[in-house]
Amino acid sequence: MKRIYKSCVAVLLLLAMLLSCVPALAAGSSHSYTTLQKAEALKTLGLFQGTNKGFELEKTLTREQAITLIVRLLGAEAEAKEKNPAHPFTDVLAWAGPYVGYGYQNALVKGVSETLFGYGKLVTEAQFLTMVLRLLQYEDDTDFTWNKSAELAEKLGLPVVPANSGEYTRGNAVDVIWALLETKFKSGGKTLAQTLIEKGVFTEKAYREVLGEDSSNIGAILPILRPDPDPKPDPDPKPDPDPKPDPDPDPDPEPTEQPVYVSPSGGSDGDGSKDAPFGSLEAVRDYLRENRSTELPTTVYLRGGTYVLNKTFELTAEDGGTEELPVTWRAYPGETVIITGSAGASLSAFEPVSGEMKEKLSPDAQKHVMVADASALDLGTISVGLTQSNFCIDAPLFSLDGQHMRLTRYPNSNSTEDWMHVETVDPTQTSGTYPKIKLTDETVLGWDHNAADRIYFGYFSYGWALHGFHGTLDPETGIVTATDASHYGSAAGLKPMLLYNAYESLDEPGEWYYDQMSGRLYIYPFADTTRNSTLRMTSSNFDLISVNGASYLNLEGLTVTSSKKDGIVMNNVDHCVIENCTLTSFEGRAVSIDNATYSGLKNSEVAYTSISAIYLNGGDYQTMEPGYDFITNCRIHDTNQYRTMNEGGVKFRGVKNTFSNNEVYNITDMALNFAIVGGGPTSLDCVIENNSFHDVVLNGKDMGAVYGGRDARCQGVVIRNNHFYNIANNDSSFPSFSANAVYLDDGLSGAAVTGNIFGPGASGEYLEAVKINCGHDTVITNDLFIDTLCAFNVYIAGNFAVGMTNDSGFGIAPSLRQVWNNELYTSRWPWMAALRDGETDVYIPNIFKNNVIIYTDAAPRGSETSAYPWVKTNDNQESKITGLDNNLVILKGEGDNRQLFVDYANGNYALIDSVLAQLPGFEQIDQSRIGVKSFPGNQKPAASGVSISGTAEVGQTITAAYTFSDADGDSEG
């Protein structure tokens, strides 16, 4: 909004406010600025940002922070965030992904290994200057060597630090960036500043202002705010002939909210004011139950710090609000609020591993592994075992300074291609049996510490059933005999397996092992760990926050972490929203929202859970009453750390609910499970749209990134305008099965799959983009398939009616019987009533038409004897699919077909006009709608576009105008 003030008093107040944020830069051409002044100027130009504690110029700079600066200096931040370029590194957190990806794709930065970026590691001067020189288009090993980058930088006029100056700081980087703006590229043409002005990163006027070269800038007004250091008396003072009274100050603005404050350092005598905040969340809640405003919305501001809970923080119906008077609990702008069930422990109790235990580790691990008595850490009871019919590892989750740690495993990979492949002995796929496997890996056979505690976790029977067991090892034969019964037994052949909880496999940063015999905890710390680092463990056995029966209650800007149960649980709520939150480290779910209407999760990051990270359900399928709930604009990753079977990263249920604009990645199994086995809630008329699914289904087969199965109540699901890429793995242990982007299983029917992009980036022979197993009445149209070897796989049962209605059929019959007498269902899907009445000719062919299928570096692999090699059916039943002749298929010719896309190399898969002309009914897919859109986070308000006019003299009027922005939209701004 635009606010214009025409009083001298108001202008002075405005300038005072601005000057508190932007130190004055000296006018003229001297440019003798302090590092702090440079940082403020660079912030004004959008090139440097602080933390919630200010610029912290004395602090060190990490590798991810360094590449973020470089990307901004190229004027490429918006492009990086929009495209989120791929990179091979597994240790990069979501926020840094676009910057690291851009830097990697443009040869600005490399990793510390093929798969590790070195996230959190401190950057050295040589490394930072190497990035800077690459930005200026100088080449490694041609123009300079990375370890002597300072020599070339100094020749170019860039500041370098003296030898033995200690660690490279953020302030050092600011000094370099400031000088870099006036440095020319290698070609000798324009300076970096000129290039950024041309790109629109900032204007020439803004640049001149920060240099003090524009007389209209704020610096030119500053003398009226500062006393003359050597004032001279007026030799002939004259009275003002027309004295004017001082203008009345503006009245206090009307309050727009009821603010209440709480702080972890607040005292028991706090009154909830900003200066005397309450000391606990319960104190605020109880105060508001008696004193909440009946005229204004209520906002509870949580001041920065860590709130350690010893029981669930409960909010109920009486704590909610109304549409006119909502209640919001939120972090104070610009401050970090952590709500946790773990007080944590300092690493000061740890010491380097020594003696016999040290000798058991790899040479590299011997240098880094640390150990402590678990009892001295006061983290709670630690145990490692199996639970849930041995489908789930029962172990805590650890984090170190907020970075997730992993139970030690061998090999260190999420992909079954890299796992050990063990031969099953005396296989039988019988429930309750004790599998046997034969180990041949010499490394593992050489290990001997606490062998009985090891967990053998693998796909021993089916490609979709990851489960585990303890066992006894015969060192002479290498045969391991399970001591835990298996739900599915084992199948013949070589099967992929991980070994968990073997001490000797503790060999990479972020791993941990607990010795259950000695009670000692071993960790391999991250590179930036110090003795003051905080180790947290999921020890509290309660949900952290519960909202039950409330309406119009919002939680914003919080970091919620560490519990054996769930993070935030909402039940029977209406118009309750979790926004701008980070939720990590839960043995249960990070978020569970049930029986809800108009409620959901948005603009948040969710990661590192033992099982599904999010559960959402709202609406009644029997009455078709909608929930209108949502999960939108979230990053969801690294879920299902200990269980994948029938889970998925997100369990999405309800009626007319929406899953939109999310990025879901780095999940070994299903990303989104919208229906599986009728009995509980289902999905009806739900929409899954504008999402990016990538690097999922990393280790299983016969499952989908988006999966629904065995539920006749699930109808009308729309899957549209999503992008699926880097799906699946190339493991050949189950050659008859693949992974899928979208999988409708065991008779699930009545969906629409439209406007999606499948590929590129599939993995070998084992990806089928869309699969339907026994279902019917689904439409797949206007989709783009890029290098998907099999675009569509459909299994068409010989007797559809029997499979749907017989309990020994597809497994869907019990759920069908729940709705085939429901007129709301049978009026929309008459085939249900027909099956109820004994009719058999009810199969409605699936439709696959108006799709574009392009191969750039692969050939289709579907039914080899079919006229449609990009389709796969059982018994060549392509004739039972409608529309196969109405698709555009472009096979690889002499070229690679990448020229058929607007900008394939940079991930723009819009089709050129000549392709669109070949399939007139195809609508161009709008990629700009896909994925996470930037969300404001917990930001402070800001003023920009300041202009001042008039005569800056006492008694005269000057006019100030500025644009006030408050990204969060909160009243505190």
Task: Show where each model-derived region lies.
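Short, solvent-exposed loop/edge segments of extracellular or virion-exposed proteins
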Residues: 265-268, 899-905, 942-954
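Ser/Thr/Gly/Pro-rich low-complexity, disordered linker/stalk segments of secreted
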Residues: 216-256
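Glycine- and acidic/polar-rich repeat regions and solenoidal domains
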Residues: 322, 565-569, 587-593, 607-907
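Extracellular polysaccharide-degrading/modifying enzymes targeting complex plant/algal/animal polysaccharides
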Residues: 259-572, 584, 906-908, 918-935
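Detector for repetitive beta-architecture
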Residues: 259, 297-299, 304-306, 312, ...
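Feature responds to low-complexity, polar/acidic, surface-exposed segments characteristic
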Residues: 2-37, 43-98, 105-167, 180-228
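Ser/Thr/Pro/Gly-rich low-complexity disordered regions
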Residues: 936-973
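Extracellular/surface recognition and adhesion modules
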Residues: 42, 235, 262, 946-948, ...
